[in-house]
Amino acid sequence: VIHTVGPIWNGGRNREEELLANCYFNSMKLAMDNGIRSIAFPSISTGAYGFPVELAANIAVHTVNRFLQDNLNSFDLVEWVLFDTHTESVYEAAEKSYMEDESDDFDF
């Protein structure tokens, strides 16, 4: 188990976005450095800490996917563990948006 403590949302005035991204990045780095091949994440900071779900999902999806691109074959499995259908649909939309943005980067 790798434990991370997410930032408390304070309107975005205290680098919360950067801190949240670091939670995902550092957890993945620690797992990779210790030979852990699977990892599961909740929606960090979106409960009691009040981070907006849509923003948190975009940060999470972007950070995790960029890490995987930069560290090919580092994980066999990465999963989201989401506790309600609203959060699940927000993460699905963030994944779809990320993939569409990535496909726009290809030049032929």
Regions found by a protein language model. Give the residues of each.
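Phosphate/ribose-phosphate-bearing ligand recognition and processing surfaces
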Residues: 8-108
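Glycine/small-residue-rich phosphate/adenosyl-binding loop
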Residues: 1-7
